[in-house]
């Protein structure tokens, strides 16, 4: 089929032509560009155009030219293209490039294929043209057939279809992109939701973890608390057990203490009974008128006195609010057994002497018996005469109280103390805090050095003395880390003086009563302060006389209208809520104050620079001894204070008064003791024996 071949050759030639190589752009119409703007080459005939013209008939060529002339005015561009297409030969190169043209819609539609076939047939059936004719024709003939116009229209329709298709594809692409964007957005939103859900899950997990941790910690805390409660309950059980054991131990100790006190009281009563029996047996050792002269009683008496002294050392220790121990009781029992054996041996010696005497003087027994009777009568007469003389002396010489001058001196000292107390009454009753604080500091500064004396000596004793002297001299004193002076208040000196004197007497009442050796350092400091500040000495005497009237000496009588409790207070007893202190405690306190008074009388401050006599020296001690012996003795107290005074101050009195002192001792032994023995209790024979040993 030659027409079919020509069609394909034509198409190949069109494809290979410059216009067939135009690049399609859908923006030509919108931008107003020319379709052939890309082809600027001058149209020229192909070398093969001659062969084509030869094969075409002249009739067809003229027909085509007429068609082209009719259509030239309407579409000159297309006629030129058609002419070029007809005149251009079809080469294999154009066949190969035809596949690249964008004419897909022409090949797909049947009408376009038919038009192409008809065009190809026209080109093939054209008669051959001679070279001369081809040369004579104009070189650029523009032939535009209706078919070309149709093709051009088809091309434009194809372009429009392509544009519509492109628009449709673009809209589809946009829809696809929108769907893709929506899908991506949905996916991202889902991802965001999943992420938020993941974050919420993670947050819930964290919260759950925190909650679990808190619950675990709470459980652990509850466990620890329960453990602590259990430990607390366990400790409480242990403490309760310990408290129960301590309470049982305390009850056992109380029971043991009660038993100890019961046993101690029993031992105390036993020792008292033993002492009473020993003293009675000691009386049996004394030589009697009926005893034979050949028997020497001196060794027995000496040993009996030693046993009494040994026993008396046990009794005072038991009297100081303590109970005698089993060893003390055993010592007392051994002393009693020895005293009994001593009495038995004495009785045996007396009986043996009597037997010897009977053997030697059997012949003179009756005569000696008469002589003994006569001698006994004479002794009785002497005793009655001595008793009558003593009764007469009692009626004429001894006093029951202090004389008027002594009472006047006693009252003046009490008035001085009362005036001093009234002088600092405002300071004593002050209510403001500053004044109260000053009062307490002054009291500490006055009493603390006295409390520190005790058994001290040397530098500590001198330091205490200097502190007291500075305080009374209105100089500043450091006490408990604070500086205080009596000049800080107008009544400070009177207050400090009164409290200082009161503290000295209290030390004698308590410290000296328990520790007899403390009387000498305290007495030395008090004597030195007395020399520098005489008013302190008067206040010390006033406080001493008030607490111990026997230091005057004075036995206050019971006046009418005075109750028993008040009278006991006047005598020096302590009365607390109607309960009077025991006799042993009373004698112990009186002994301490008398010892302090005796120490003050004989002691001098060793560092004193003053010369001269003591303001209250040994002459007052001699006066006290004389006055106490001129007064009727009182049971217990007289022997106690007389012994304490002589034990502390006796040596000093002996050195100063010598013979007169020994005369005084003889009077005590020969006249005072017999009077005292008439009413003294057996328990206080110890003091009498001590006084006898002084002789």
From Swiss-Prot:
Residues 105-126, 216-255, 326-433 form a coiled coil. GO terms for cellular component: cytoplasm; extracellular region; nuclear pore cytoplasmic filaments. It comes from the Eukaryota. Transmembrane segments: none annotated. Its main location: nucleus. Residues 203-226, 354-400 are annotated as: Disordered. May associate with the NPC. Belongs to the GLE1 family. This is mRNA export factor GLE1.
């Amino acid at each position: 089929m030659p027409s079919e071949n020509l069609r394909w050759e034509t198409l190949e030639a069109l494809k290979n032509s410059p216009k067939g190589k135009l690049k399609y752009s859908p923006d030509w119409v919108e931008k107003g560009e020319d379709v052939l703007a890309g082809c600027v080459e001058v149209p020229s005939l192909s070398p093969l155009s001659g062969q084509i013209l030869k094969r075409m008939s002249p009739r067809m060529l003229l027909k085509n030219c007429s068609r082209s002339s009719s259509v030239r005015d309407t579409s000159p561009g297309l006629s030129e293209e058609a002419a070029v297409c007809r005149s251009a030969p079809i080469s294999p190169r154009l066949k190969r490039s035809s596949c690249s043209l964008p004419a897909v819609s022409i090949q797909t539609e049947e009408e376009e294929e038919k038009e192409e076939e008809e065009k190809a047939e026209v080109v093939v059936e054209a008669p051959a043209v001679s070279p001369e004719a081809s040369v004579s024709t104009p070189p650029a003939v523009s032939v535009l057939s209706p078919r070309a116009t149709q093709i051009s229209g088809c091309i434009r329709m194809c372009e429009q279809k392509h544009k519509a298709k492109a628009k449709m594809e673009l809209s589809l692409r946009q829809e696809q992109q929108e769907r893709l964007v929506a899908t991506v957005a949905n996916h991202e939103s889902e991802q965001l939701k999943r992420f938020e859900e993941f974050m919420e899950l993670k947050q819930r997990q964290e919260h759950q973890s925190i909650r679990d941790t808190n619950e675990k910690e709470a459980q652990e805390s509850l466990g620890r608390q329960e453990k602590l409660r259990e430990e607390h309950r366990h400790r409480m059980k242990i403490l309760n057990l310990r408290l129960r054991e301590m309470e049982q131990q305390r009850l056992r100790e109380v029971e043991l203490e009660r038993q100890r006190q019961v046993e101690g009281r029993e031992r105390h009563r036993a020792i008292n009974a033993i002492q009473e029996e020993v003293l009675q047996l000691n009386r049996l050792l004394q030589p009697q008128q009926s005893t034979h002269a050949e028997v020497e009683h001196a060794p027995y008496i000496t040993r009996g006195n030693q046993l009494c002294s040994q026993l008396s050392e046990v009794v005072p220790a038991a009297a100081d609010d303590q109970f005698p121990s089993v060893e003390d009781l055993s010592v007392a029992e051994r002393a009693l057994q020895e005293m009994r054996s001593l009495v038995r041996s004495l009785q045996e010696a007396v009986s043996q002497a009597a037997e010897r005497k009977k053997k030697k003087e059997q012949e003179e027994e009756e005569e000696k018996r008469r002589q003994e009777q006569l001698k006994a009568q004479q002794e009785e007469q002497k005793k009655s005469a001595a008793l009558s003389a003593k009764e007469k002396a009692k009626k004429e010489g001894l006093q029951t109280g202090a004389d008027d001058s002594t009472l006047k001196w006693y009252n003046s000292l009490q008035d001085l103390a009362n005036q001093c107390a009234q002088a600092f009454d405002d300071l004593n009753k002050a209510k403001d805090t500053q004044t109260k604080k000053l009062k307490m500091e002054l009291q500490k500064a006055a009493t603390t050095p006295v409390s520190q004396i005790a058994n001290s000596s040397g530098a500590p004793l001198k330091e205490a003395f200097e502190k007291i002297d500075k305080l009374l001299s209105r100089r500043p004193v450091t006490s408990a880390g604070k500086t205080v002076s009596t000049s800080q208040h107008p009544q400070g000196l009177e207050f400090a003086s009164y409290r200082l004197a009161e503290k000295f007497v209290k030390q004698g009442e308590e410290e000296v009563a328990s520790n007899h050796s403390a009387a000498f350092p305290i007495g030395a400091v008090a004597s030195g302060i007395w020399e520098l500040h005489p008013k302190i000495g008067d206040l010390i005497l006033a406080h001493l006389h008030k607490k111990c009237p026997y230091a005057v000496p004075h036995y206050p009588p019971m006046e009418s209208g005075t109750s028993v409790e008040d009278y006991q207070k006047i005598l020096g007893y302590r009365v607390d809520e109607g309960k009077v202190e025991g006799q042993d405690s009373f004698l112990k306190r009186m002994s301490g104050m008398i010892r302090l008074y005796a120490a003050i009388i004989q002691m001098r401050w060793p560092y004193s620079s003053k010369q001269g006599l003591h303001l209250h020296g040994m002459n007052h001690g001699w006066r006290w001894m004389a006055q106490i012996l001129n007064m009727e003795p009182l049971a217990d107290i007289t022997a106690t204070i007389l012994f304490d005074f002589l034990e502390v101050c006796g040596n000093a009195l002996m050195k100063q008064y010598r013979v007169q002192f020994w005369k005084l001792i003889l009077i005590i032994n020969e006249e005072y003791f017999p009077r005292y023995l008439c009413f003294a209790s057996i328990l206080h024979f110890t003091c009498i024996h001590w006084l006898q040993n002084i002789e």
